[in-house]
């Protein structure tokens, strides 16, 4: 895959969706979520597993963060996917003239060497949490607690895709999404490169019959579980 810098502005989310489709990170079919719901699409950020691909996705993260206007001093990547995403985003930001530190946590505390659960830059000032998606919000909750315990302030959560999906199971559907719960509980914005709304807009505009055929199933899923 040839690495290209993503555009700025309103086209960013649509370009990201095309990029995710080309990379196989976003796919359509019938998938079962952790909540037991049958989803017509699947987003697997673990497939951003090539150097050029990771460099490109980092550009999307960096451009989205800068465009948000959120003030920040450090990036924090929760283990495990967030580690790579935060470090790659820091590299992309440096290339744009915004050089900041990044840190991440270990799942298990280390009792030798530097010790503890935190690795990397000191958590200070305003910290942006970088991850792939927000499912139940557990990772964000743990990250916020670590950031505050270090004396820093959580400033925002930066993710690739907002599924805009109510919490709960296939039968018991909640009233809010995990993203909305995070924003309400911690009073910080959740910034997404793209959302389910953007995905539907992409499918509406697509000239690809295979993609257009998925539009009805995605729209029905949003009707049932979306916010």
From Swiss-Prot:
One of its GO terms (cellular component) is cytoplasm. Keywords: Glycosyltransferase, Magnesium, Pyrimidine biosynthesis, Transferase. Orotate binds at residues 42-43, 135, 163. GO terms for molecular function: magnesium ion binding; orotate phosphoribosyltransferase activity. SUPFAM superfamilies: PRTase-like (SSF53271). Homodimer. This is Orotate phosphoribosyltransferase.
